[in-house]
Amino acid sequence: MADWSAEQYLKFEDERTRPARELLAQIPVVAPGKVADLGCGPGNSTELLVERWPDASVIGVDTSADMLRQARERLPQQKFIEANVAHWAPPPGTEVLFANAVFQWVPDHLKHLKRLITGLDEGGVLAVQMPDNVDEPSHVMMREVAFQEPWRHQLSQAAELRDLLPKPGAYYDALRPLCSRLDIWHTVYNHVLDDAAAIVEWVKGTGLRPFIDPLDLHERKAYLAAYTARVAAAYPPQSDGKVLLRFPRIFIVAIK
């Protein structure tokens, strides 16, 4: 898959940042010395961490060069490193690991969550938020269109890229033995967007990328037209012409 686009991602910055704010609000640590933002993206979540803990050493970690470029422009005083969270280990003494919308892309991510919480000192926090929307119409229709001709051959692997998230009980059973306190909850957002085209613009920044990146311009245009038509049927306009994008997310706060 091509690099993530910070510009596309930030078209809905307020909506994308809200879950990070709500995750951060549930972290009870008062004055951590070291904080890491895993999957920091363009720095919108890192900025929240810096505002909450201005005296902490906050680092951002991401695999995307374009996201890191935007993050460094946004927060030039902060440290950002290019690394895969599946292989990265926090510096000794890190007290908060903050992961907003990254681990849904990491295969076998439960294993990595266990590794990260195990590496924390007593009182350290692993805070995670992940979209839980693979079965939402917006994502089901990506796969349905991808399995049609003429895209079936090129996009069959993309259609299988993201698995359903484990059930909350699986996270509980895996993490509870490793921590003193564990909170798990779901929030379902209903984002008010202008129309079906706005939903497509939203997912072009994240979930749709594996489907459109392998296509040339002509193929991409045709795929997006077919996908947009399905989105318009699945998300009818409200009384004022707007549409509601239903968006479930799972939150996990584990305290060592």
From Swiss-Prot:
Q: Which GO terms describe its biological process?
A: methylation
Q: Does the keyword Magnesium apply?
A: no
Alphabetical UniProt keywords = Cytoplasm, Methyltransferase, S-adenosyl-L-methionine, Transferase
Catalytic function, reaction form? trans-aconitate + S-adenosyl-L-methionine = (E)-3-(methoxycarbonyl)pent-2-enedioate + S-adenosyl-L-homocysteine
The UniProt entry's coiled-coil ranges are none
- Annotated Pfam families: Methyltransf_25
**Where does it reside?**
Cytoplasm
Any idea of its EC number?
Answer: 2.1.1.144
A single GO molecular function term of this UniProt record: trans-aconitate 2-methyltransferase activity
- InterPro entries assigned: Methyltransf_25 (IPR041698), SAM-dependent_MTases_sf (IPR029063), Trans-aconitate_MeTrfase (IPR023506), Trans_acon_MeTrfase_C (IPR023149)
**What EC class does the entry list?**
transferase
Q: Which GO terms describe its cellular component?
A: cytoplasm
What superkingdom does the record give? Answer: Bacteria
Q: Which PANTHER family does the record associate with it?
A: TRANS-ACONITATE 2-METHYLTRANSFERASE, TRANS-ACONITATE 2-METHYLTRANSFERASE-RELATED
Family designation: Belongs to the methyltransferase superfamily. Tam family.
What role is this protein assigned? Catalyzes the S-adenosylmethionine monomethyl esterification of trans-aconitate.
Which HAMAP family has this protein been placed in?
Tran_acon_Me_trans
Indicate what this protein is called per its UniProt record: Trans-aconitate 2-methyltransferase
Question: Which source organism does the UniProt entry give?
Answer: Rhodopseudomonas palustris (strain HaA2)
Q: State the gene name recorded for this protein.
A: tam
